[in-house]
Amino acid sequence: MQKRDATTSAMVKVNAKTGEETILLDFNAINPNLDEAELTAEENIAITKDYTGLLFYDDNDLFFYSIPQNKVTRLTNDKDEEVNPMISPDGKKVAYTKNKDLYVVDIESAKETRLTNDASDVVYNGYASWVYMEEIIGRSLNYRAFWWAPNSEMISFLRFDDSPVPKFPLYKADGVHGELEWEHYPKPGDANPIVKMGIAHINTNKVVWIDEDENVDQYTAWPFWSPDSKEMFYQVLNRDQNDLQILSAHPATRKNT
């Protein structure tokens, strides 16, 4: 948790039984090292698991501060927004979506790799369609539909094709006169988006698509990895929502059981 008072600005760990606090990151000590980059430690958007690095989003780009190296690295440098950046478990990479495609950037070299290439107005990779965000994955993920493997070598993600989903007009009360926008919004009985489960292999830049029948009307989501990253589990729920299956997918073979 973050603790801020008249003298302290830090990330602390609190013993629930005794109330004893242990400082994990002293933001007051870090901030002078961020002055040149015009960053503030308290405004980080993510922290590495070992508390040695901070990720920032500033000026429409990603920056990473390494505490051991006392170094700020600009990871991206373009006009496009990096959405839902997630640090890999080993703290060496950051994954995100950009223009509805999935990307990863190496923190040390700032080399960006595009993992998918077919995003469009109706196709999204690692970025949820509206109905999945609202009803399946949940709002708390902010449209994020990708998940790191524990070994940091793979990312499972969902690919959405909204082309069969009817559009629905939504009025936004912005500005003086407001505006009308159109959202792919399935009503009861309408077609849902076509969903595929993919696994992106970071080292080879290859995507493996898990075997599924795209013509079956079902919900595919909620993946989680085994601790050794050898299997990826996910759930499939039929449209009537009375038959839930938990499947195991094998990243190298595409097969599920």
State the predicted function of each range.
Residues 1-257:
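Beta-propeller folds
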